[in-house]
Every structure is written in C-alpha cells, then in structure tokens.
Regions:
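C-terminal-most transmembrane helix of multi-pass membrane proteins
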Residues: 16, 184-186, 220-272
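Helix-helix packing/entry segments at the starts of transmembrane helices
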Residues: 14, 73-79, 141-163, 196-232
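Hydrophobic transmembrane alpha-helices of multi-pass small-molecule transport proteins
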Residues: 23, 95-115, 135, 166, ...
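C-terminal transmembrane-helix exit sites in multi-pass transporters
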Residues: 22-27, 80-101, 224-243
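Transmembrane alpha-helical segments that form core, pore/gating elements
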Residues: 9, 19-23, 83-86, 90, ...
Length: 272
C-alpha cells in the first residue's frame, strides 16, 4: 500500500531511519540486565554485521512485493524458519527430526505456491527466497551479537545502517519527492514505529535469551498474519494449487516446532 506513491528504496529508507530515531529515548533510559560477553568487535562493525543482512532482507522483500502477492510473499519469506536450523547445524546447533520433516513439507509447499505449470519460478518468488536467506543470516548474527552488545543499541544501529543504505539506492534509482512521502505517510509511520522499531527490537531482546531456532519459530507466525492481511485487506485470493502449498507449508512450520529426537549434532561441535 505504501509503495503506491513512493519507490521501495525510499519507503524502506525513511521507514528504518524513523525506526532508529524512535529508539533514541529508550537508549537513554535503557539499562542492560545481563552482563554482555567480552568481545573485540567494534560497535560500528557489529552494526554492519547485523544491519547489512537486514538491509538485504528488507530490500529484497520490498522489491519482490512488486512482482508477487503479499500472501505468497509472506509464506515464502517464512522459509527462514527452515533455513535457520539447517544453517545452524554448521554453527554447532543440533538438527532435530521434526526440523527435517518440516523442511520437506515446507519445501513441497513452496513448490505448489511458487512453481507455475511450466515449472518456472517468478522473479518476485525468487527475490522472496533470497529475502528469507538474508533474514536467516540476520537471525544468526543477532544470536551472536546480542550476547555481546545491548539489544536496543544493536537495533538502533542496524535500523540506521539499513535506512542509510536504502536512501542511497533511492537517490540513485528513484526520484523521492515530498508529495510521494506525504501520500505514504501513514504506512511509513506504521511500519517505521510498530513493524520496525517495536517488532525488530523485541526480536533482538528476545534473542538474547533464546536460541535462534526457537526465535525463528516464533517469528514464523508473521506468515499467518501476512496471508490473512493479503486476503482481507488487499482482496487477494489463493488458487487450489496455492492453497495446497499453504497447507503443506503450514504443517511443516508447526511440525518443526514440536520437540523431537536429535538427528544430527552440530557439525562444529562434533568436529571439536
């Protein structure tokens, strides 16, 4: 809705800068409850480590929305739920049985949602899968960095990095103007404050106290709200093929959240 009057880079640039600025009062009053682990990583580098994956994920998502529906985008982006435990295996995190079964079900769902009758995948669907991979990296980075820096400070930094990078692209590839920003004011404010400043900061704070796989499971509920939003507010609809894909992917998502035996131990841990 917000991109009716502004381009995706302009939308995300202003949105994330607003999200960063909205955290300034909380940075002043915030007190760290858990002592951070020692680190040699400079603060600016930490901002880039978590901000660049967020920039890639948010930008790919925003651009991809121009080539696919909000409902399909929501379900495809949710693939980070399955990418997180699989990539986590290479970071020393165990792979559970239900994670593997859930991944197979969800990939079948992705096929039915994204692949057309001529076995092609649309540009928007491909961008959304790359978006999911970017968010996977961001989740793992947050898991590592929130043990070493304040989650609120990290959030403000990653938002500013994402916003500035988007604004740079906006001035290169778009023509931002005040009239367009005024037309998208409410969507930008909503996503900047609630979807960005509040939601992403709560994610960062939560990831300080839980492993990335559990965090991705909770975050996956976004796909439910995204799909319902597309159906009820944007007059979108699912074909029978897409409905089968949605059911398969939803089953895979929820199955992966059920505790089960370990299939593979983390590769780093096993090799040590």
């Amino acid at each position: 809705v917000g991109m009716d009057t502004v381009g995706p880079f302009t939308f995300n640039g202003v949105r994330f800068v607003i999200g960063s600025l909205a955290l300034l009062p909380f940075l002043y009053f915030h007190r760290e409850g858990k002592s951070p682990l020692p680190t040699s990583i400079p603060l600016w580098a930490a901002f880039l480590m978590v901000g660049i994956p967020l920039f890639l994920g948010a930008t790919l998502q925003q651009v991809g929305l121009q080539y696919t529906t909000a409902s399909k985008a929501s379900f495809l982006t949710a693939n980070y739920l399955l990418m997180v435990p699989i990539t986590g295996l290479f970071l020393g995190q165990p792979l559970l049985r239900n994670h593997l079964i859930g991944a197979i079900l969800a990939m079948a769902g992705v096929y039915f949602i994204s692949i057309t009758s001529d076995f092609s995948i649309s540009l928007g669907d491909g961008l959304m899968l790359l978006c999911a991979l970017s968010f996977t990296v961001q989740i793992h980075m947050l898991n590592y960095l929130t043990q070493r820096f304040s989650p609120v400070l990290l959030s403000a930094g990653q938002f500013m990095v994402t916003g500035v990078l988007n604004l740079m692209l906006a001035f290169l590839f778009e023509t931002p103007d005040l009239a367009g920003l005024e037309g998208a004011a409410w969507p930008i404010l909503y996503t900047g404050i609630l979807s960005t400043s509040v939601a992403y900061t709560l994610q960062a704070v939560g990831q300080k106290y839980m492993p990335p796989t559990e965090a991705s499971m909770i975050l996956s509920m976004e796909m439910v709200f995204g799909g319902l939003s597309g159906l009820f507010f944007l007059d979108e609809s699912f074909t029978l093929r897409q409905t089968i894909g949605v059911i398969a992917m939803t089953l895979g998502v929820f199955l992966s959240q059920i505790p089960s035996p370990v299939l593979l131990s983390g590769l780093r841990r096993r090799n040590q």
